[in-house]
Amino acid sequence: MTQYQWQLAPQPAAADEHALSETLGVPPFLATLLLQRGINDQADYDAFVHPDTSRLHDPFALHDMDKAVARILKAIEQNEKITIYGDYDVDGLTSSAIMLETLQSLGADPDVFIPDRFTDGYGPNAEVYAYLQKTGTQLVITVDNGVAGAAVIDPAQAAGMDVVVTDHHELPAKLPHAVAVVHPRHPDGDYPFGDLSGAGVAFKVATALLGEPPLESVDLAALGTIADLVSLTDENRVIAQLGLKMIQTQPRVGLAAILKEAGVAPETVNETTVGFVIGPRLNALGRMGDANPGVTLLTTFEDDVAAELAEQVGKLNQERQGLVAKIAQEALTMAQAPENQAAKTLLLASKGWHEGVVGIVASKVVEATGKPTLIMNIADDGETAKGSGRSIEAYHLFKALEPAKEHMVHFGGHHMAVGLTAKTTDLPSIHAQMEAAAATMLKTVPKPTLPISTRLEDADLTLDHYQLIRQLAPFGQGNPEPVFSVRPQVIQNVKQIGKENNHLRFQIDQGINVIGFGYGDAAETLATAQAVKLAVQLDQNTWQGHTSLQLMLKDYEVKQPQVIDWRMPTIDGGQFKASRTYVFFDAKVKQQFERQFSFGGPTTIAAQVQAPLANAVLVDLPKDAAALHQVMQYVQPPVAVMFYGAPSRLVAIPTRAEFGAVLRFLKAHPGFDKHHIPAIAKAVHLTVHQVILAVQVFFELDFVTIEGAFISPVTAPAKKPLQTAKAYAARTAFLDLAQQLQTMPRAQLETMLLTEHSDSEVES
């Protein structure tokens, strides 16, 4: 069943969707996606789809940018020693590379210092700053760090080493007294976009220093922006679009080497490539050891240097993947302990867990359990533990843990992620605070939500439509890749794939392939399912030069049949033994069956059902669609259906000749007693029901009169088509409905009967 709580995004008004679809010449579902993103007209669309540096904000709108630029230019002019102090993740490495290239282009020769994750830690380090000052550094420019470093920066500044802070992380209560603090959310600033990455801030500083956006570095800014999971909206979208285009068409030497080592063609690079190919490789440097080679790899012009470093990061990434798999398995086993299953949050700690990958492991545990999680490595001496936490949308991890800061040696982070160091004896207190916060933030442990953009029909599932969706890329925070609900009629060729059969491949309608990573266990369930809802993303697959649409499975729901098929041509009474409520449309049929059979539950007339009714059986045929619709407003699925119709009720409408035979009989027998209709039936070789229908039609068309019990023909009646009689039309509609209800395949019948129910389920 579902791993997620599906959450249908607000759907635009049909009129708005239609208008935008017509204006842009795009399918309605794409108009829905655009409207959900605030794109309401052609101008909005052009601005969203086509990147333009004119949509980048003035860098001097950032607080302290003028001070930062003045101090940096002064250092360059006076040939001061400058050190760029970066960070060991992708955002930090790309920020450092941007600042390095910018200062070099202005004639400076700065040093770059990337702290060691394990010995220096994140952000300003007092020993490192003292070393920098001792070795002659006169200006430190922090990139992707520093805003929380007042305890280190203030003494350094007071001792004569100037610091310019450029950062984007959570703002602490006390900011450092640096020469400048350039931050998009500075409390004294009013920059129009607060969600720049560290690389984005470095790019803005570079723009201010150079007088124009350094487009030669926009690829680096895009890498940091995408990898750091900041919102891909506003100018971040422009940076990401321009940067990805540069990587696709003119990749720098180091990135070309990474892509070659990974077997990825540059022209296919997109945000997914950054997230799953480039990003993990660069991050592996800092996670597994020294990240400084990352800056060299990103800035070198030498092919052999790039190739050697790319091979190194590839091997480190493989090693990192092995560690993650091992630790994640151990952590998930611990999560199954009774005390952890009962908890709303998890704090899992052990010796021997590599500190460089605990954040990734935490993400995997959150994904598997839906619980905010801290993964802590206990030092060899058992005294301290260091780790990372990841969270879910409903639980602000930083705020949850902030009251427990007194129990931590180091602590920092934001809504969805934190890093901390603490004494092992304080871990129970920290977890207790997590649980206390969960009591208010999380009433229950919810399934993680899966936003559904809209529902797609079979006709929407085309390669051309996938290409249209890609126009909305790059996808990420603030611009999520659309997930769609689809309801295939066919699930076939279900097969487990992968070395451990932990993935899945199957086909749906039109032979479209669906790939489900991590869904290998669902093979049997999907192969035998009668009704399935899929949550998917559209993708493409190229094999032997042929490109086709494929769907990526994000979740699925196997529905129990909402219509239980008890239809059969004869009734023997065995169908009525179940403890259900038996609903009849025809009171005469109800009376007849009650005389013939015993029922395991109550019987009722459909017209009398005026409240929700569960466990119902629809026994006979409704007289018309309105009667069926009326009862379906109250019948709760699953509902069993028999739709029995006695053969006498299902005889065909008389032919024109047979109608004529009845009319001639009545003309030959004026004043005929209607109680003797069986005599007419015998004379003209029709059933009694057919003759009754003919008389009703003749009466409605003024071909006969009926006074009391006597039927008399009208002399020289006006000619009227038989089909214009209400009785004729009603009989035709009844027979058509009966044909549908008795012969329609179960799945189609379910759709017909329960559209309202199934729609509300998908949207919930």
Language-model regions: role of each:
Residues 87-88, 115-118, 145-146, 168-171, ...:
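Short, ordered loop/turn segments at secondary-structure junctions
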Residues 130-208, 216, 233:
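Active-site cavity-forming subdomains of large catalytic enzyme subunits
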Residues 177-227, 626, 630-634, 638-644, ...:
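Short alpha-helices
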Residues 104, 237-306, 310-328, 391-393, ...:
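Acidic, two-metal ion nucleic-acid-processing modules in DNA metabolism proteins
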Residues 2, 14, 19-139, 159, ...:
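Hydrophobic helix-and-loop "lid/oligomerization" segment in the mid-to-C-terminal part
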